[in-house]
Amino acid sequence: NSQKTFRVGFLPVTCHLTCPVTDWINKSMTGKGFFFPVRFSGWPELKEAFLADNLQATFILAPMAMALRQQGIPLKIVYLGHRDGTALMGHKDSDIHSFKDLKDKTIAVPNRFSNQRLIIYKGLKDNGMKLEDVKLLELPPPDMPAALQSKAVDAVTSGEPFMAQTEMDGYSRVLYQAKELWPNFISCVLAVHERVIQEQPEVVQQLVDGIARSGKWLDADIEHRMEASQDVAQQYYHQDPRLLRFVLSKPPDRVTYSNLMLAQKDFEEIEALALEAGILEGPIPFQEYTDTSFSEKTQGIEPYQWNPGK
């Protein structure tokens, strides 16, 4: 019954990959899943579905979850989605090679409340610049490759595999990987309605455990990543599998999924930048928007013991 009633939102980005991978592994191993993954194309639709109670949980931008809690939405962050897995891309024919070259240029970001926006803010700040020195344009990640190819924007940044798509198709180059600007970068988290935590804590724990196990499974063997790329891209993302294969292997640590327990210092760094950038209205206590009890129980959890190739 939980599969029918426990709906989890995700976007077709690698920041959310553990959501479909958990479902895929469980269905492959046991013939059934224990939650229903719901795919969205953009942040506005996903956010509205969560606020309308059409989702029990969702992968969501970390600053967006913090801001929603600040606005009175009863949610809790219970786990991380990933580490790293974001790049800033410029057109290969452009004269942009550093943040200094971005002055007066147009940069596409996924959302006002995205950590990609904070990466831009941090990079500008580290180079003695301000947000006002560039033009930020909000675009759904799937629309970014076409915008960069047509030179409608000068640079783009979002979760993968859309940055890799621009690289593979030959019209872009990497300006910066997220880890160069912000080591152990976090974009997205898993958020759950507080009511759901109170009413179905066992399903929330099962979900967090599954995500932890699938994340470690992905990081354990490059062949696991290649197998997941093929099936998840087709069945859940509706994308060319070569995109996920590229992102998950070149190099393998381009995005990682093992170190996903909640740590206060990570969110204090996000909060500090979000306050400076004007995303948050004011400070918000870590305990107010997180429930660390679920992630704490994943300490030492083993990856799924499954080899799809055998």
Residue ranges, per PLM feature:
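Pocket-lining segment of extracytoplasmic ligand-binding domains
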Residues: 63-64, 94, 137, 142-237
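Amphipathic, soluble alpha/beta structural segments
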Residues: 60-67, 80-87, 231-234, 242-244, ...
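Short, glycine-/small- and polar/acidic-enriched structural segments
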Residues: 1-130, 135-138, 154-160, 171-176, ...
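N-terminal hydrophobic or amphipathic helices and topogenic motifs
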Residues: 1-39, 268-310
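Short amphipathic alpha-helical segments at helix boundaries and their inter-helical linkers
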Residues: 150-153, 251-265, 296-304
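Extracytoplasmic/secreted proteins, especially bacterial periplasmic and envelope-associated proteins
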Residues: 20, 41, 45, 49, ...
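Hydrophobic alpha-helix position signal
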Residues: 68, 124, 166, 232-234, ...
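Secondary-structure end/capping motifs
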Residues: 198-282
